[in-house]
Amino acid sequence: MSADNSSLVPSFVVFQVGTRRVALPRDCVAELIASPILFSFPHTTPLITGVVLRRGRIVPVLDLGPGLLGAPSPQARFFLVVERRISNSSERCAIPVQGECELVAGILLPAAGEDDFVTGCLDLNEERIDVLDLEKAIAAGVRSEEQLISAAEALS
């Protein structure tokens, strides 16, 4: 019996948040949904831009823009539904994405940047794509959002 070598190479989902192309490991991505209705409501939770209904469930929408770009992401037509691992349980959330998403196989190279939420990078057709640690990227966004709120309060 021969081993299938393609299963040894990890897969990643490459997507775009604002102007930045990034990737997540394939195993934390559930699906890509197009044009769902985004329901907004008053709240104080950082990064949540609203919720979408998917398969009879309410899925919070988390914007990674503040952590990755320093500003909220532009409005999106597509949402990547991902599994967050929180303690011993998991929860689905949706991330607004711009442009195309693609599934790629590649070797995870060491991280070259300063961002603590980047676990490594992929070399995709001579383009360096950062691979994110989802929980650390969300935490970076929360910190960025809190800094923006503090700065706005200081100005008023």
Residue ranges and their predicted role:
Residues 1-156:
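An acidic, low-aromatic, low-complexity terminal/linker signal
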